[in-house]
Design a protein with these regions (language model features):
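Alpha4 helix (beta4-alpha4-beta5 surface) of REC/receiver domains from two-component response regulators
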Residues: 63, 85-102, 107-111
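Conserved acidic carboxylate
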Residues: 9
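Short hydrophobic/Thr-rich beta-strand motif most characteristic of the beta2 strand and flanking loop
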Residues: 26-33, 41
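Acidic catalytic/metal-coordinating carboxylates
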Residues: 34, 60-63
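Charged docking surfaces used in two-component/phosphorelay signaling
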Residues: 16-24
């Protein structure tokens, strides 16, 4: 699916904001609230863009990020990391297209997401 975006964020309120922002940028969006569910979904499809929280239940964002980078199906997938942890942001900065420090506004994410469209 060319315009598929995954929002992998366990905070339901923040996830809803991310979903609306991605939809406003023209993506078909799926929200996933759990790292284990994200692992399963990533085996089924390679989205155009992923918004990835680093602190997730069951499987953390760092583990998902390693899996994404190890899979050639994701070579064109853009990654936006979202974290409130400045240390994690620095550690993983080179593994993502963009690292956002929470809190993140609707307009920030919408505008950044729109940059990655075909």
């Amino acid at each position: 699916m060319k315009n598929l975006a995954l929002v992998i964020e366990d905070d339901e309120d923040l996830s809803a904001i991310f979903v609306k922002a991605m939809e406003a940028a023209g993506y078909q969006v799926e929200a996933i609230l759990d790292g284990q569910l994200a692992e399963k979904r990533l085996k089924q499809a390679a989205p155009r863009i992923i918004v990835l929280d680093m602190h997730l239940p069951h499987v953390d964002g760092a583990t998902l990020l390693k899996q994404i980078h190890a899979n050639p199906n994701f070579k064109d997938t853009k990654i936006i990391l979202a974290t409130a942890d400045n240390v994690l942001a620095e550690i993983y900065r080179d593994k993502a297209n963009i690292v956002l420090i929470k809190p993140i506004t609707f307009s920030q994410l919408r505008d950044l997401s729109a940059r990655f469209k075909f």
